[in-house]
């Protein structure tokens, strides 16, 4: 196994919007921003944030750059979140290994992978708590992030 199976955690100071509540304009924004991050990765490589570095160092997870790039190239955006001033997306891979798919949280500002975990392929989140999401959150990314 390349990654730890994910557990749902609530993060202080974080607001989230599930992709099912995105407007058409918001869908365009987050997918364009993802393309920008992908281009950054292709030019300078994948960078990982301190949180993920700590998880790797502490043995909480393993990390694969190859699997992370596959996720960037072939995934669905599951949610958008704002944590402090950072704007992030959660990507769920279409590529499965051992009946698991990789999920990564990527900063749209820095391009770094914030965290990474695995989900079962058949996990359709029937137990997902809708109270963790704000369907009224307005996604309004700066133009330089969506070009």
Predicted regions and their residues:
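Ribonuclease/tRNase effector modules and their secretory precursors
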Residues: 1-147
């Amino acid at each position: 196994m390349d990654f730890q199976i994910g557990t749902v955690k609530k993060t202080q100071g974080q607001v989230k919007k599930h992709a099912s509540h995105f407007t058409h304009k918001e869908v365009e924004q987050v997918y364009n921003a993802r393309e920008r991050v992908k281009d950054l990765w292709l030019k300078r490589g994948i960078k990982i944030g301190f949180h993920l570095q700590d998880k790797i160092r502490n043995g909480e997870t393993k990390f694969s750059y190859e699997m992370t790039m596959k996720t960037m190239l072939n995934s669905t955006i599951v949610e958008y979140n704002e944590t402090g001033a950072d704007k992030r997306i959660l990507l769920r891979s279409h590529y499965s290994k051992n009946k698991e798919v990789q999920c990564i949280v990527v900063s749209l500002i820095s391009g770094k992978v914030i965290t990474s975990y695995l989900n079962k392929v058949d996990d359709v989140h029937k137990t997902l708590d809708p109270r963790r999401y704000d369907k009224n959150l307005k996604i309004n990314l700066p133009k330089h992030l969506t070009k």
